[in-house]
């Protein structure tokens, strides 16, 4: 799975959005209390305004939907752990979009104060809800080949040792 560099026009089905949302909502919660909240943007005007707040590559301007992943600090039973749930939900969105034939691109909102403030105002979020990430969705014009970032040098067993496992 990787970011898709070109998105073609075409509406994203409600069923695909619901499947993506279902996967994102079913993550294990580190913060407990399921503090993740989601704002689906599917109107051109809202997408355009959001792209002025969160830097996105030009190709994402063709996306016909985006999901803003937010954390509700009041629902997080463990303070400041809401962001971990948002990160896991964002990853689920990327993976489920890919499984549904969609391309996706993720942009960080949190911890950038200007982006948080701008998105909070645009979406009229209550004070306890913090926007975390912005995921653009669209059908890929072409799918690049799979990328393999595996490196044995990044794997350590039983401590910071650079050697293969004895398994």
Which ranges hold each PLM region?
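Acidic, surface-exposed loops and disordered segments
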Residues: 1-167
């Amino acid at each position: 799975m990787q970011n898709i560099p070109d998105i073609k026009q075409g509406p994203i089905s409600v069923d695909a959005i619901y499947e993506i949302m279902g996967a994102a909502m079913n993550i294990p919660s580190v913060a407990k209390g399921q503090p993740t909240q989601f704002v689906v943007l599917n109107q051109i005007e809202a997408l355009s305004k959001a792209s002025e707040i969160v830097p996105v590559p030009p190709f994402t301007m063709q996306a016909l939907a985006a999901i803003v992943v937010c954390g509700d600090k009041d629902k997080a039973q463990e303070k400041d752990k809401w962001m971990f749930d948002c990160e896991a939900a964002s990853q689920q969105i990327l993976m489920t979009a890919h499984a549904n034939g969609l391309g996706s691109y993720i942009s960080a909102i949190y911890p950038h104060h200007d982006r948080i403030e701008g998105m909070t105002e645009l979406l009229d979020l209550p004070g306890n809800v913090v926007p975390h990430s912005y995921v653009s969705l669209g059908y890929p014009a072409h799918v690049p080949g799979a990328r393999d970032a595996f490196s044995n040098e990044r794997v350590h067993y039983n401590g910071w040792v650079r050697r293969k496992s004895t398994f």
